[in-house]
């Protein structure tokens, strides 16, 4: 796979020789060799398949026919945000102004190291062939989206064989929009696809893919008292180790934490990162669980507002399923952010909400929530509705793996019988009220998600935002 990707990129590079980011010769031996750490990067690193696939075949069960397909995807690999880049640059400033020879795990900085953020215009943006730090980088968001499109055709191409004209939906974040466009490009020119760009501003209210932005009641400090109980001495230990190896360096625990982000986003930009080799395996586990803990209590089941936020998109998904027989469009593809996907999965009950994560230690038995498993860069959640004989079923496929509903999985391929699913969905949203809980009326008059139904007359074309 890696070789085929490299050959494809090299072919493209010959046509764009004037803009090739050549990198260094040593890169060839390093690029694509760090996939084992992707699960520990909290979703900031490149895409990888869901590890807990339970051995269930993703293929449509024998004798069944797909009736509807929905997909909610995250934008592809990107550069850091403006705010995070500021923090990374602060640590880089300390390192770049160190006047002595580096020792230990920082010794790579002696070898003409090139900082991966070359242009501030790249911040917040998708990594592409044009802005990647190395021509051989297989992890660009552009390549990921195009590869996803080819995988989609291989898995579900029959769903669009007789429907060459359809809409694809994206938030108006530029990186989400770019991912959607690269995906469309990857499908080929045999389709007439209308890209609907839906606003993610708070004024969009309920008519959005990004309900969290329309929720002024969202408290970003909620549950900090729980998360802050987590032991972060591993960060102190990293800083102490690096400072001991390099006299006078004076890195802090904040710098140590920043290095994890640096590692992830550098891999996105150049295909590998020497910074990632700074950490021990134990330190990666500690960092990864902190990301899980923080997400669980800020964007997942541990924050009581999330089920209501996620219900906005989940209710629309269920409505589409119920209308599959009368809707001309059978495939519904949408691109947005990781938070929106996490909110959706929380409401859907795919993320375990029966056992709250503990901040007292790193749990290994019974812990099924890992942020990076669900929302790596380029994450994708498919909702399949298929018919077998006279019965119809629903199941979820997350990042290439079938993930059954725990209490409803007795159907073919560990799916949920359709009426049982509707009962399940009704119970999941019982007591939720996105408009009321989020106080949406204070920022918008829009009280319903309608873009899946009125796109052909409204023609959504929100201005793109660098966020």
Swiss-Prot record:
GO terms for molecular function: acid phosphatase activity; nucleoside triphosphate diphosphatase activity; ribonucleoside triphosphate phosphatase activity. It is found in: Secreted. Its EC number is 3.1.3.2. The keyword ATP-binding does not apply. It comes from the Eukaryota. One of its GO terms (cellular component) is cell periphery. GO terms for biological process: cellular response to phosphate starvation; phosphate-containing compound metabolic process; regulation of cell size. Glycans are attached at residues 97, 103, 162, 192, 250, 315, 356, 390, 439, 445, 456, 461. It catalyses: a phosphate monoester + H2O = an alcohol + phosphate. Pfam families: His_Phos_2 (PF00328). The keyword Cell wall biogenesis/degradation does not apply. Gene3D superfamilies: Phosphoglycerate mutase-like (3.40.50.1240). Residues 1-17 form the signal peptide. It is an enzyme of class 3 (hydrolase). Induction: Expression induced during phosphate starvation. Repressed by inorganic phosphate. Transmembrane segments: none annotated. Keywords: Glycoprotein, Hydrolase, Secreted, Signal. Glycosylated during secretion across the membrane. The active site is at residues 75, 338. Partially mediates extracellular nucleotide derived phosphate hydrolysis along with NPP1 and NPP2. Belongs to the histidine acid phosphatase family. This is Repressible acid phosphatase. The gene is PHO5.
